[in-house]
Amino acid sequence: MGQTPAWRLRAVIATAFAVAVFGLPGAASAAVSAALQTRLATTAADQRLPVLVTLRDQVDAARFTGHPQALIAALRHASRSSRNQLPLDGPQRVTRFWLVNAVSLDASPAQIARIAADRDVASVDLDVRVHAVDTVQASDILKSAGKGDWGIDAIGARSVWDAYGITGRGQRIGVIDTGVDAANPDLVGKIAAWHDFVNGRAAPYDDGAHGTHVAGTLVGAAAGGGAIGVAPGATLVVAKALSGQGAGDGSLLIAAAQWMMDPDGDPATADYPTVISNSWVSPAATDTWFLPMVQAWRALGIVPVFAAGNVGGAGTIGSPASYSESVAVGAVADDQTLTAFSSQGPITWNDVNGEGFAPGTVVGKPDLVAPGDFVMSSVSGGWATMSGTSMAAPHVAAAAALLRQAAPTMTVDQVIATLKATADDLGPAGPDNQYGAGMVDAFAAVRSVLGAPPTTGLVKAPPAIVATNKVTFQLDGQGASAFRSRIDAGSWSAPQASTAMTLSLASGRHTVQVQAVAANGIVDPKGITRIVTVDKKGPQVHVRKIKSNGKTVLVAHVANAAWKLTSHSFHWSGGQRGARAVCGVRCPASVTVQDTSGARATTRIASALRR
């Protein structure tokens, strides 16, 4: 990604920071969350609780209109400016954040009271526990990926590759999960950046299977057989923030989300991902704990995609998928019906701190659905099928990456709107609380910005069986300026403008594919396919005499099975026709065979055989 000159970036930062920093409403004391108050009621004086302290000076990422990289610098500046504003119990280990101007620490009830009374503190919350969206089904580890992920064709990803040559190349996709096994053959060379927030290990790993499976659906290749990744040309920015069992602290998720915005720690480099796939959830639908994170991602140009959850039934979507700023993804089976486990909307907000919607506001969810049942993808040691909205979310995230490659200047709002507008509407007409806008259609989304591919028309094809090495296809096609071909799944030829395409084929059976190519390089992903057999030997006929019901019968056999004979193909010189001819007074002197291409072969019958 490009870089902004340092002097220009500083100027942009100064301007943006001047209008972006604001103070949260003042009060006699900070708001202590209901969950924290409940825990404090049963906490001894010498015990400590994990809390997140949010300070009043904040950068409003949701209203930020400056340069994206300037947002990172402004967020960092706000955090540094308030670094000494928190009352601590002497030397104390704290984690400071800049994504939201906040601090996490373990604090005693007395310290929490002092912090809440500080005029620079806006709120004190109990650190929330999150977990990976549990898989509903998981197969044993397999030695190959078989036919691959059925979802790739279901959402039109393969058509995007074939028609537009778009595979996600140049796009980075973020994933916050249990880690990734970078040694899986489908993920080798796919990791662009890595950070372990759980154990601090330098090299990528996955002590579960969840993260590696998600990663495979995002960018996996086809080393195990069939293709498993929707955007195989993209790379991954991976943050391990969940344990191998899929559990994690909210503060670790904030740290991972913050790192996603600036993996190399240099605001002048735009190394953040274009979309982040999240298959984890916090149980409370209207918990605004992660709202600043999602808003900051969007302000930076990152599409936030979240699994809806696997609880099933109405009103069961957790946060952050429940936010209007998030793309919540439900799961469908291969017959395009909603899975029983897929969490549904609507979400009714009971927000009391003013950070979310007004109490009683109803938000429709999910936003989209995607394949999430028996999805084949990578795991440590091989491949496996899994089911869950965790498997559906990466289909949508990778589709967003394909769309971003097709239209790099699209905003987050435009990407999401395009994915919804081009989705395959399922269930009741229009958006609903089971399927959202429908099943994501990557091909329709890309087509909407790049135009429809050309079509390949066939005026005349060569015969199925020919006796020459040269064959000619007479072609036409709507929107076509040229045509390309390949033989037996080899390399595609360079496009040629002529509508008469002559190919050289070796002897034998061949699969010939021809595609129309538009002036802008877009190709017809379907094209035409024909089987052509070259056999220059021609048919070989053998005749033998048998006795049938006391009569002498001559039977002709064709030795070369490559030739398919026309009906009534045996032509007896005596005028009789058929596969078997009964000798009468005068037996034929020869037999002629004609094949579907019109080629003939004649075999004389010895007089001794005819007697």
Go through each PLM region and give its residues.
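Low-complexity, disordered linker/stalk regions enriched in Pro/Thr/Ser/Gly
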Residues: L450-R611
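Substrate-binding/specificity loop regions of serine endopeptidase catalytic domains
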Residues: P204, W280-I302, A307-V362, F374-A393
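Inhibitory N-terminal propeptides of secreted protease zymogens
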Residues: A28-V136
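Short acidic, glycine-rich surface-loop motifs adjacent to enzyme active sites
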Residues: M260-D287, A307-A308
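C-terminal subdomain of the subtilisin-like protease fold in secreted/lumenal serine endopeptidases
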Residues: T38, D149, I228, A270-S277, ...
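Protease zymogen maturation seam
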Residues: A70, D118-R172, P185-D186, P283, ...
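Subtilisin-like serine protease catalytic core
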Residues: A31, D46, F64, G148, ...
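Short, small-residue alpha-helix embedded
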Residues: L218, M391-P408
